[in-house]
UniProtKB/Swiss-Prot annotation:
Molecular-function annotations in GO: DNA-binding transcription factor activity, RNA polymerase II-specific; RNA polymerase II cis-regulatory region sequence-specific DNA binding
Stored Pfam families: Homeodomain
Protein name: Brain-specific homeobox protein homolog
PANTHER family, sorted: BRAIN-SPECIFIC HOMEOBOX (PTHR24333:SF16), HOMEO BOX HB9 LIKE A-RELATED (PTHR24333)
One Gene Ontology cellular component annotation held by this UniProt entry: nucleus
Chain's role: DNA binding protein that function as transcriptional activator. May play a role in the determination and function of cell types in the brain.
InterPro entries: HD (IPR001356), HD_metazoa (IPR020479), Homeobox_CS (IPR017970), Homeobox_TF (IPR050848), Homeodomain-like_sf (IPR009057)
Calcium in keyword set: no
Start-end of DNA-binding region: 110-170
Keyword terms, alphabetized: Activator, DNA-binding, Homeobox, Nucleus, Transcription, Transcription regulation
Subcellular location(s) per record: Nucleus
């Protein structure tokens, strides 16, 4: 038995010729896109991709083991600065002010230095001459000198402080300089030592028969003279 099953043939609609008339263009309206509610999108995303506790999607093992083309974007510190992140519900939420959220607070402002005072030649000459005469000035003297040189009292006080420090450094450097020490030793004369006095000849002890005084001379008589002496008297 020959059974032939033939499927019904549906007529294929002929394609509508394309027209560039304004009426055809206006009549051809695109179908509106169907809006998907966020709850449906979140549920479908959560059902397809499991999420971790802190909101990042858990990728399959092969994807984790394969080298990522952009490893720098998957560093732990990059997730804090990424403008979009996934919450636990799976909905991407844009971060507000991503570049300013983790900006460091500016440090303390550096104290600006005051502008350095530039003295004229006449002012420097007057200050140097006064410094040679007097190293320390009282308040009335500073006011008087500042008025004479068209300066402020603070400028004169600061200049004298700096000049005293410079003078002390110069003295310390000159004392530590070996050439200066050698010149100072050569310039200072050696003290003259007193000449030793000439030694007087030492007199020996007088002998037993040495007469010191002519009045002490005694006539030595012989034995015959001693016997004949009474007859002379």
């Amino acid at each position: 038995m020959n059974l032939n099953f033939t499927s019904p043939v549906h007529p294929v609609p002929a394609p509508r010729p394309t027209s560039f008339f304004i009426e055809d263009i206006l009549l051809h309206k695109p179908k509106p896109l169907r809006e998907v509610p966020p709850e449906h999108f979140a549920g479908s995303l959560a059902s397809r991709v499991p999420l971790l506790d802190y909101g990042y999607p858990l990728m399959p093992a092969p994807a984790l083991l394969a080298p990522h083309p952009h490893p720098a974007l998957h560093k732990p510190e990059h997730h804090h600065h990424h403008p979009y992140f996934l919450t636990t519900s799976g909905v991407p939420v844009p971060a507000l002010f991503p570049h300013h959220a983790h900006a460091e607070l500016p440090g303390k402002h550096c104290r600006r230095r005051k502008a350095r005072t530039v003295f004229s030649d006449s002012q420097l000459s007057g200050l140097e001459k006064r410094f040679e005469i007097q190293r320390y000035l009282s308040t009335p003297e500073r006011v008087e000198l500042a008025t004479a040189l068209s300066l402020s009292e603070t400028q004169v006080k600061t200049w004298f402080q700096n000049r005293r420090m410079k003078h002390k450094k110069q003295l310390r450097k000159s004392q530590d300089d070996p050439i200066h020490e050698e010149n100072r030793e050569q310039s200072s004369p050696e003290p003259e030592l007193p000449e030793p006095a000439a030694a007087e000849p030492r007199k020996g002890p007088p002998g037993p028969f040495l007469l010191q005084d002519p009045e002490d001379e005694v006539d030595i008589l012989e034995e015959g003279d001693i016997l004949a002496a009474p007859h002379r008297l």
